[in-house]
Amino acid sequence: IERYADQGRCVAHIDGRVVFVRFALPDELVRVELDEPHDRDDRFWTGEVVEVLEPSEDRVTPAWPLAGPLAMGGGVGGADLVHVSLPGQLKWKAITVSEQMSRLGHIDVAVPIERMPGDKAAGGLNWRTRIEMIADDNGMPSMRRRGTHNRVAIDTMPLATRTLLDVAKREHVWEGGFEPGSQIRLSVPEPRGEIVDTAAADDNYAVLVDGELRAGSQLLTEQVTINGTTFDYQVDANGFWQVHRQAPIALGTHVINLVNGQLQSAADAVIWDL
């Protein structure tokens, strides 16, 4: 395996042809099963690790095995770097962004990547404030196996915040009873601010089935504290909001600090809101 690529894949070559390999790491020696169909006229192939012969020091046992390689009992997707240690994940992202800045933008720059507060202690889990699933033929919440329409029933979602998991348990989501094929969405604002409170979400959550509210509230209250100022937002349960529990704080704080830095030495300024 030669180098990092996109979508949690790495680059290798077979008979001179590029192969994008899932669940690999640079400098590893692995056995790969190629995705079908493929033929020798293809510009590149894709495949997945089925055996690791010489592992990288950044390789770990997947914390969520169901999202790991299919040959190792996984295959549902949703956690592309589940086989990579937390420091290795930061290295992967920093190198990938730096390479793209150089290749596409012709800018050579170091890209610092930092974890949000609480991420390390949680082992990289429990950060999603929204999850989406599909009901299988038995009405159980499930996820599709990667690259197929096959549905794999799940009884938890390790990437979801603990607050969301508490709501899912309280609303009996994991017990099933859904119409087969229905789309299930949980939106649970994580209490935000300088100190994150993991208390119960009261009715500030939504369980939606095929876009219709089943439990909670259609309008959710999101709260973000930036540099000591708290902002409240009303967001539709079907609407967009940053998925990571700390992303709005990090993004908002960074932008405000950049703007303040420009304004401090300027008589006037134009700020573009994209």
What is the predicted role of each segment?
Residues I1-L274:
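Accessory RNA-recognition modules of RNA-modification enzymes
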